[in-house]
């Protein structure tokens, strides 16, 4: 790290410390009870209060100006590639005339920003008057459990489909909240043309642009990217293990398959019968290979694809027939016939 980079990192750390010192928000319980994320400090407690096996959606308050004036909306994700943790989709929106606010925030591709810088921008989005008056945002935390079950179910749902459904769901929730959307900018998953066609079919009245590297081209997408990335980072920091595991910070690494710390975590924290803790995406080849190498092999009988044919028993089968006088002859019970038992007395 160069001397200049070292100075920048130190400044960012100082800013984060100032956020903690100057933030006079209520305690963790109030964060969870209010359901509002009003600063960076509130993000972790909010996430910690949610069930991490289920998806969580959060929408900020909509600035009044976003209800009245035409807005641009950006969409991006964080955590698509890792084998560990959730994938987070984020949106951010502001009036078409409010580019200055995005510039003042310093919005840029979240992957090119340090963690400290992302945290500072996220905090400013939620605390600075020039931002809260015209910028809104929302995220969906898509659990590893949802990702795995979607990709493993009989009618498989690919990660691209999960991503597109989340993006469209967040756009729809912004519409329902009253945001006056005019333009939408999306960082693509898969071919941009197909994604754009799908979005236009769902939202035909919007001007929609789907592009590669949109987070480094459009500041509104950069803002969405920052919200998504900061949310994912904090989701990992406050992750609760219902399996009862005690995991130290950073013991599972970045979560990316190529990270040796992550690979070691997958090797050490594997149950030979039940597999991995809920943090892991079972559907990733890295996890599948680790299970194949270490876990017990399981065999399950394949259910018959054809439904069995049941012949209904007719009521007349229980009777032998009738006598000449028309009296019905009742069939003897199989239990007595097999044991050669018969009635010796008439009652």
Curated annotation (Swiss-Prot):
Coiled coil regions, renumbered to chain: none
Cofactor(s) it depends on: Mn(2+); Mg(2+)
Record's cofactor remark: Manganese or magnesium. Binds 1 divalent metal ion per monomer in the absence of substrate. May bind a second metal ion after substrate binding.
Any one cellular-component term (Gene Ontology): ribonuclease H2 complex
Positions contributing to a divalent metal cation binding: 76-77, 187
Catalytic activity annotation: Endonucleolytic cleavage to 5'-phosphomonoester
EC number: 3.1.26.4
Domain of life: Eukaryota
Keywords: Endonuclease, Hydrolase, Metal-binding, Nuclease
Molecular function as annotated in GO: metal ion binding; RNA binding; RNA-DNA hybrid ribonuclease activity
Residue ranges constituting the RNase H type-2 domain according to the UniProt record: 70-296
Gene Ontology BP term (one): mismatch repair
Pfam families: RNase_HII (PF01351)
Enzyme class: hydrolase
Cysteine disulfide links: none
NCBIfam families, alphabetized: ribonuclease HII
Family: Belongs to the RNase HII family. Eukaryotic subfamily.
Function: Catalytic subunit of RNase HII, an endonuclease that specifically degrades the RNA of RNA:DNA hybrids. Participates in DNA replication, possibly by mediating the removal of lagging-strand Okazaki fragment RNA primers during DNA replication. Mediates the excision of single ribonucleotides from DNA:RNA duplexes.
Entry protein name: Ribonuclease H2 subunit A
Species of origin: Drosophila melanogaster
């Amino acid at each position: 790290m160069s001397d200049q980079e070292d100075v920048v990192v130190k400044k960012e750390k100082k800013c984060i410390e100032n956020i903690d010192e100057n933030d006079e928000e209520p305690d963790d319980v109030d964060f969870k009870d209010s359901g509002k994320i009003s600063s960076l400090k509130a993000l972790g407690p909010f996430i910690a209060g949610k069930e991490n096996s289920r998806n969580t959606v959060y929408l900020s308050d909509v600035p009044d100006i976003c209800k009245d004036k035409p807005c641009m909306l950006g969409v991006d994700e964080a955590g698509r590639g890792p084998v560990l943790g959730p994938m987070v989709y984020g949106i951010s929106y502001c009036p078409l005339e409010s580019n200055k606010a995005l510039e003042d925030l310093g919005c840029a591709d979240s992957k090119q920003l340090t963690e400290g810088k992302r945290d500072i921008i996220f905090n400013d989005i939620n605390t600075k008057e020039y931002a809260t008056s015209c910028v809104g945002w929302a995220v969906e935390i898509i659990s590893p459990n949802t990702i795995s079950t979607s990709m493993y179910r009989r009618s498989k749902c690919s990660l691209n489909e999960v991503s597109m459904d989340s993006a469209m769901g967040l756009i729809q929730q912004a519409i329902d909240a009253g945001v006056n959307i005019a333009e939408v900018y999306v960082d693509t998953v898969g071919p941009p043309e197909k994604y754009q066609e799908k979005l236009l079919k769902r939202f035909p009245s919007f001007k929609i642009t789907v592009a590669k590297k949109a987070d480094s081209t459009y500041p509104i997408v950069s803002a969405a990217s920052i919200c998504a990335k900061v949310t994912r980072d904090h989701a990992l920091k406050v992750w609760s293990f219902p399996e009862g595991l005690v995991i130290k910070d950073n013991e599972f690494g970045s979560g990316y398959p190529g990270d040796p710390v992550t690979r070691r975590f997958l090797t050490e924290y594997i149950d030979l019968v039940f597999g991995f803790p809920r943090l892991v995406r079972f559907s990733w080849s890295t996890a599948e290979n680790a299970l194949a190498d270490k876990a017990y092999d399981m065999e399950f009988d394949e259910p018959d694809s054809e439904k069995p044919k049941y012949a209904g028993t007719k009521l007349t089968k229980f009777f032998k027939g009738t006598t000449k006088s028309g009296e019905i002859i009742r069939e003897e019970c199989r239990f007595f016939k097999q044991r050669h038992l018969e009635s010796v007395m008439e009652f």
